[in-house]
């Protein structure tokens, strides 16, 4: 599945600007880090505690060490003392990143290729997938989740506590009020969404979510023995919309001209302080010296809601670098070479085998994983085993006006939205999303005409090719000059697509309305619907093995309406 090719990685300066004065193959180990104290005197007496912190919609430019105007002293310090991941990739929207983190598999192998899981959809992370916390439980870990789930909840079996977490406090949907925890999925379809375990946590309403989640992490640490390995998954709601922040954080950004940027900056700084409190609790309760802290964003910043991905192209929801290049670093006393920047190619699917390996377990491509164990690359500066990334193939998003099978050399329909990185080359087909280069927002009102101008500039294309090492800003399209590379990468897309399973994107169910669940979002599926879903999953597995069976007439009719509904919902998105 993974082609081994030469790869030149991207150099990222600590101020967030990408340099052009070097090219270094990915198969060469990183340069030396700070000597001396970086070598631990002895192996840890037990598997390390693992703390994975995931932020929501934090842009590439929205951290101090990338030259931002936002204050993030904690993140800056932790990154400086650890290993900055400056060739790190995530997915462009919420659900795909979270699903790949917890399964180690690309979207094409879980059926979540299209969009996100919406609150009223009978859909969730496939139940036949063994999740990262389940693997860590097998290794003797206590597992806890705090924050945003966004991987489906229509059945109780989909809930975090049924997918490997011993405890859970957070929201099930993708977007809630930071104080009231209300979420509206359309006019009049509103409900409360804060859960503790499998119960609605009505009594915790009114507390700002970033602070509430940090307090819960501290409580978990205070009540847990450092002698038992611990996995903490902290998925902050911050800094996703709505833009809400405690007043004391807003005051320090009162001179910012752009209101959205001002609120967003306050939220980022509040989140930074929450990370400081979590780190302090790790030290206070005796966990820190045997801990590995991973920090990651989930997708690019939403540029018209305060975020910034400058100087990268694009934003959240796009396959340009601004949508898929992630913020990431690892901080740990267990790192063998600290205080350095790693340019090893890393993808969010890699955390699954990497963390399972740290826990003493095994996980590899033989288990159907798309991720690699990148701990030697991170901790020791060795070469990354990864040489390519399938960003995605979305067969339902095939509306690019100028795409065709002919334009894809007869092997690929370029109207289909897809993106792949192989070595130093990146190929995009279909509609990758809005391709602006948007500077940090400083004006009181952002000129929306820039948006339309950029769209018009690329309106007649459906294939792009970039040398990401030489052109990290994606300004020079080489598709016309290098048809040989285009054809080779299209062939890789074809190879990947042969392994894809059908998309899971069902129609919304009216019974999911919170009014039928006491005013809160929560599981709603009946036993009959659960059986039907299991039958559908079985058909999907049979399809992926090439053994589709004939269906009865009513089944065909049902399938027709499902596909029709999917098309309509895709158009709506």
Curated annotation (Swiss-Prot):
Q: What class of enzyme is it?
A: hydrolase
Q: Which gene encodes it?
A: ARSI
Q: Which Gene3D superfamilies match?
A: 3.30.1120.10, Alkaline Phosphatase, subunit A
Q: What sections of the protein cross the membrane?
A: none
Superkingdom of the source? Eukaryota
Record-listed Ca(2+) binding positions: 56-57, 94, 298-299
Q: Which residues are glycosylated?
A: 277, 289, 467, 497
Q: Which family does it belong to?
A: Belongs to the sulfatase family.
**Co-factor(s):** Ca(2+)
Species assigned in the record: Canis lupus familiaris (Dog)
Where does the signal sequence lie?
Answer: 1-23
SUPFAM superfamilies from the UniProt entry: Alkaline phosphatase-like
Region of interest: Disordered = 516-550
Q: What is this protein called?
A: Arylsulfatase I
């Amino acid at each position: 599945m993974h082609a081994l090719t030469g790869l030149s990685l991207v150099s990222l300066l600590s101020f967030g600007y990408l340099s052009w004065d070097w090219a270094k193959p990915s198969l060469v180990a990183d340069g030396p880090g700070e000597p001396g104290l970086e070598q631990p005197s002895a192996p840890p007496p037990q598997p390390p505690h693992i703390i994975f912190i995931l932020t929501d919609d934090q842009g590439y430019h929205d951290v101090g060490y990338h030259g931002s105007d936002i204050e993030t002293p904690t993140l800056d310090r932790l990154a400086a003392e650890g290993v900055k991941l400056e060739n790190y990739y995530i997915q462009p929207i919420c659900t795909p990143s979270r699903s790949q983190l917890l399964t180690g598999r690309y979207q094409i192998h879980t059926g979540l290729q299209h969009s996100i899981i919406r609150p009223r959809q009978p859909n969730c992370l496939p139940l036949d997938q063994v999740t990262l916390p389940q693997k860590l439980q097998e290794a003797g870990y206590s597992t806890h989740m705090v924050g945003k789930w966004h991987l489906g909840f229509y059945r109780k079996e989909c809930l975090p506590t049924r997918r490997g977490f011993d405890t859970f406090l957070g929201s099930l949907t993708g977007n809630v009020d930071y104080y009231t925890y209300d979420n509206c999925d359309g006019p009049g379809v509103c409900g409360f969404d804060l859960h503790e375990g499998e119960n609605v946590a009505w009594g915790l309403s009114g507390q700002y979510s970033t602070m509430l989640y940090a307090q819960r992490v501290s409580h978990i640490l205070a009540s847990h023995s450092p002698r038992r390995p611990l996995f903490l998954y902290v998925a902050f709601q911050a800094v996703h919309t709505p833009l809400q922040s405690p007043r004391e954080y807003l005051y320090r950004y009162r001179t910012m001209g752009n209101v959205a940027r001002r609120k967003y900056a306050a939220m980022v700084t509040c989140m930074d302080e929450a990370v400081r409190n979590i780190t302090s609790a790790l030290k206070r309760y005796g966990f820190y010296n045997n801990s590995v802290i991973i920090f990651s964003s989930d997708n690019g910043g939403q540029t018209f809601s305060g975020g910034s991905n400058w100087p990268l192209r694009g934003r959240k929801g796009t396959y340009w670098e601004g949508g898929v290049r992630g913020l990431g670093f690892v901080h740990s006393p267990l790192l063998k070479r600290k205080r350095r920047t790693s340019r090893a190619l890393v993808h969010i699917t890699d955390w699954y085998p990497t963390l399972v390996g740290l826990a003493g377990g095994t996980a590899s491509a033989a288990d159907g994983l798309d991720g690699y164990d990148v701990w030697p690359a991170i901790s020791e500066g060795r070469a990354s085993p990864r040489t390519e990334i399938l960003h995605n193939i979305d067969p339902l998003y095939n509306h690019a006006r100028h795409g065709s099978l002919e334009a894809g050399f007869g092997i690929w329909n370029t109207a289909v939205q897809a993106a792949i990185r192989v070595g130093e080359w990146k190929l995009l087909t279909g509609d990758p999303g809005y391709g602006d280069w948007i500077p940090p927002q400083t004006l009181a009102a952002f000129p929306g005409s820039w948006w339309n101008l950029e769209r018009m500039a690329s309106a007649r294309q459906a294939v792009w090719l970039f040398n990401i090492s030489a052109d990290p800003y994606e300004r020079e399209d080489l598709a016309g000059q290098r048809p040989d590379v285009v054809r080779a990468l299209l062939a890789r897309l074809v190879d990947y697509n042969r392994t894809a399973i059908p998309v899971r994107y069902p129609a919304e169910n009216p019974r999911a309305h919170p009014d039928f669940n006491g005013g809160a979002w929560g599981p709603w599926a009946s036993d009959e619907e659960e059986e039907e879903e299991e039958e559908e999953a079985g058909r999907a597995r049979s399809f992926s093995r090439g053994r589709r069976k004939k269906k009865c007439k009513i089944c065909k009719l049902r399938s027709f309406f499902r596909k029709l509904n999917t098309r309509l919902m895709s158009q709506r998105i």
